């Protein structure tokens, strides 16, 4: 299965991955509208972290044995049988945050709405996730390892 991998040595912390993720998951799919006009602004599913001088993008690892999936009491976190990606069904999420507490990567967060979790979905339906496609330094790669 292809996954997104961060290359910390190439990340400059520009946060374009966050912006393009937000736009990809917005209603309008337009940067200005998504960032400034939409009332129900979505949460970027990737976040840039910094540790000392090192910056890197953090997103769901789509684990082979996902703790979040095992911990979810409603089945809102599930594995897509076709792609193997670990996905989230917001309609089934009750906001118990078990997925957030059990994720070893810290890659699941509360959505802006506050009552459901938010995580990377690998931009389902796209050949390459928006964060990878728009990274100016190729600090994010989408590949099988």
What feature does the model see in each segment?
Residues 1-145:
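Non-ligating segments of multi-cofactor redox enzymes
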């Amino acid at each position: 299965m292809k996954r997104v991998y961060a290359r910390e040595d190439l990340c400059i912390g520009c946060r374009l991955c966050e912006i393009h993720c937000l736009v990809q998951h917005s209603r309008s799919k337009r940067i200005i509208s998504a960032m400034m006009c939409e009332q129900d602004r979505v949460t970027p599913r990737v976040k840039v972290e910094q540790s000392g001088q090192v910056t890197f993008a953090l997103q769901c690892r789509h684990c082979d044995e996902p703790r979040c999936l095992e911990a979810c009491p409603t089945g809102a976190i599930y594995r897509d049988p076709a792609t193997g990606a670990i996905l989230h069904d917001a309609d089934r999420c009750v906001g118990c945050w078990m997925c957030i507490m059990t994720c070893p990567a810290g890659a699941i967060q509360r959505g802006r709405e506050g009552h459901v979790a938010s995580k990377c979905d690998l931009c389902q339906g796209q050949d390459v996730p928006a964060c990878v496609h728009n990274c100016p330094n190729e600090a994010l790669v989408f590949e099988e390892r």
